[in-house]
Amino acid sequence: MSVAWPKIVLFGDSQVQFSFDPTSSPWAALLATRFQRVADVITRGFSGYTSRSARIILPRIFYPENILDVEAFVIFFGTNDLSGKDDAPQYHVPVEDYSENLEEMIKYLESIGLKKDKIILMTPGPYHGEKFLKFCEERGRTLPSRDEKIVPEYVEACLNVAKKHNLESINVYEEMKKDEDWPRFLIDGLHFTSDGATLIYELLKPILEKKIDASEMLMPDWRDINSVKPEDASKSVPV
């Protein structure tokens, strides 16, 4: 008999795309280690994407057939949405539209069979403009700047959507800002360092552990397998 393997889905922008990178921000890798032989951690990260583009591609990536066995679905957008509307109009998404896009994604996931209590929203993290510009200049890059003052507006919008739909949420901005030396969490003023990745992992882990029983690994422990009759191991596989 086949074994259903629970899934943890991380859907977001570059913060998710880079989340398995061991050289920068491996928070998905940390989750995968914590939930090994318990659940698959699946990343669907799209660098440079906004909530607007995420809303468009969501039905092309997730549908009734592959949403089965998903026990947790994390939505993590907003980093690009708050780009300056004059500096980067192709990225900028007004905060009202950001809220609407999150709501539409939630509604779509519900429509294909995902229970709302499995959805987790994560707010944008803090932005350090000086560090970001220095990083870009050192590499000869021209990247869209953000206005540090409007970040809290998008954070609040995300939290309000979560509250409206009774979803669990993580205030990444607030949790990082609690540290007096919060810029250490950001490698370039925007994306996470290894310290930032560890914090994200520590914030997500207890929420995921409430949704997925991580007390026992799937399939029998090797010590419980009869080396003479290994087929007997199937008897201890949960049905």
Located regions from the model:
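Alpha-helical cap/lid subdomain in secreted, periplasmic
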Residues: 2-5, 30-40, 55-239
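Catalytic nucleophile-elbow at a beta strand-turn-alpha helix junction centered on a G-D-S/GDSL motif
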Residues: 5-21, 25, 49, 82
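Conserved donor-binding loops in enzymes that form glycosidic bonds
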Residues: 13, 46, 190
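Short N-terminal amphipathic alpha-helix/helix-capping patch enriched in small hydrophobics
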Residues: 23-28, 50, 54, 58
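Short beta->alpha junction loops
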Residues: 43-51
